[in-house]
């Protein structure tokens, strides 16, 4: 009868043969190698069943189908062919952090929140840079560069002592008069600042101070402002980066933008 047998060229094959009492033989070739190397051909093979006219014919069309199926299995699936994979980022490269953009200034650099925009507003002496949230200008960052006779930031004293010399960064009380405000304010005061945390570090041989301050006003605007200040001295200049966000937005996601901007600040 006409039968179809499959062979794998240039590779070893494993075979098994079994014989039944009725003298019907069959041969099977099994391989775990690449299916696109599979070759099929039709063969003439005699069998006792041919005399009874009950022969089973495997057509060449079936053999061709086997080849097509093997080629399909052996082919590689590209990322473009698997749209669902792109959405899940299964095949793609690890996504880069797009929340921040690198900013290189004159003698300093830092990471700026990608959705914040540059602003021409100048608040403080020596201010050379300002970025703010397009939807809430309370969330912003500034960089100031001013001359100094200090050789290191530690020459200003402790972080707390340094803050008293640059307290203008926290904003000045605009109202002076007799008033008693709720919320723990002293008599006659409508604004307060609490130093929450201080730290110091050395980067590239330069000493840095980082201060976390919570300022509040009697009008309760935003529940207060979280302000992070990073400062250092280099080449006879005092470099300060201050980033801030309102208390409400601070806990709604703005915290990471403020902290990253302040802690990424460094001088060349």
From Swiss-Prot:
Gene Ontology MF: a single term: calcium ion binding
GO biological process: photosynthesis
A Pfam family assignment: PsbP
Keywords in alphabetical order: Chloroplast, Membrane, Photosynthesis, Photosystem II, Plastid, Thylakoid, Transit peptide
UniProt keyword Transit peptide, yes or no: yes
Localization (cell): Plastid, Chloroplast thylakoid membrane
Main location: plastid
GO cellular component: chloroplast thylakoid membrane; extrinsic component of membrane; photosystem II oxygen evolving complex
Transit peptide, start-end: 1-82
Family that this chain belongs to: Belongs to the PsbP family.
Protein function: May be involved in the regulation of photosystem II.
Name of protein: Oxygen-evolving enhancer protein 2-1, chloroplastic
Gene name as annotated: PSBP1
